[in-house]
From Swiss-Prot:
Compartment(s) of residence: Cytoplasm
Lineage per the UniProt record: Bacteria, Pseudomonadati, Pseudomonadota, Gammaproteobacteria, Pseudomonadales
Gene3D superfamilies noted in UniProt: Periplasmic binding protein-like II
Known catalytic reactions: 1-(5-phospho-beta-D-ribosyl)-ATP + diphosphate = 5-phospho-alpha-D-ribose 1-diphosphate + ATP
Biochemical pathway: Amino-acid biosynthesis; L-histidine biosynthesis; L-histidine from 5-phospho-alpha-D-ribose 1-diphosphate: step 1/9
PROSITE patterns hit by this protein: ATP_P_PHORIBOSYLTR
Protein name: ATP phosphoribosyltransferase
Coiled-coil intervals: none
A family per Pfam: HisG
Membership in a protein family: Belongs to the ATP phosphoribosyltransferase family. Short subfamily.
Length: 211
């Protein structure tokens, strides 16, 4: 049995057509079903529907053989015990700093609000900058507006939400896309099955971007 961990939302919507290329189609619509374990048209493949931030944990600990996770989540989580064999080139965005339009960056200690605490620590350590990291789980844009932080670090797609709140994207940190991840033990135990799936998905990704 192959178990694939996915999270609802944009990643799921973009991943399902790629899985369909490999003949893997859920027997129920994951967006409408309340089930968290969903069979597929292949008897030996099932989907686990979990939170985006939990996908690497399920895969690392072997509760899922494979998963699809954003590079932002993998950068924050660390990705130990995982293979990352394929960039699916879906859910594209950028990880960036952002701040209020026209604000001058303070020379002293910087206050940065983000849910990507580990990424922020590494980023500013590489710059030799002292920062106070404030962990938030959502509505990052509020932090600079009410004086909680000087900057935020968040994923930026169109930038419309930032601009609507008087903020602007500033420093680029990383390009983000969704990656296929594989449990290392599963790769050894089910190598032929998993490698065949990787190859099929790679062809589907390449075909989509050629078109």
């Amino acid at each position: 049995m192959l178990t694939i961990a996915l999270s609802k939302g944009r990643i799921l919507d973009d991943t399902l057509p790629l899985l369909a290329e490999a003949g893997i189609v859920p027997t129920e619509n994951p967006d409408k079903s309340r089930k968290l374990i969903i069979p597929t048209t292949q008897d030996d493949v099932r989907l686990l529907i979990v939170r985006a931030t939990d996908v690497p944990t399920y895969v690392e600990h072997g509760a899922a053989d494979l998963g699809v996770a954003g590079k932002d989540v993998l950068m924050e989580y660390g990705g130990q015990g995982l293979y990352e064999p394929l960039d699916l080139r879906i859910a594209l965005c950028k990880l960036m700093t952002a701040g209020r339009v026209g604000d001058v960056e303070p020379k002293g200690r910087l206050r940065v609000a983000t849910k990507f605490v580990n990424v922020a620590k590494r980023y500013y350590a590489e710059q030799g900058r002292q920062v106070d990291i404030i962990k938030l789980y959502g509505s990052m844009e509020l932090a600079p507006l009410i004086g909680l932080a000087d900057k935020i670090i968040d994923v930026v797609d169109t930038g419309n939400t930032l601009r609507a709140n008087g903020l602007e994207p500033q420093d680029f940190i990383a390009d983000i896309s969704s990656r296929l991840i594989v449990n290392k033990a599963s790769m050894k135990m089910q190598h032929a099955r998993i490698q065949a799936l990787i190859d099929t998905l790679r062809k589907a990704v390449e075909s989509r971007h050629r078109g």
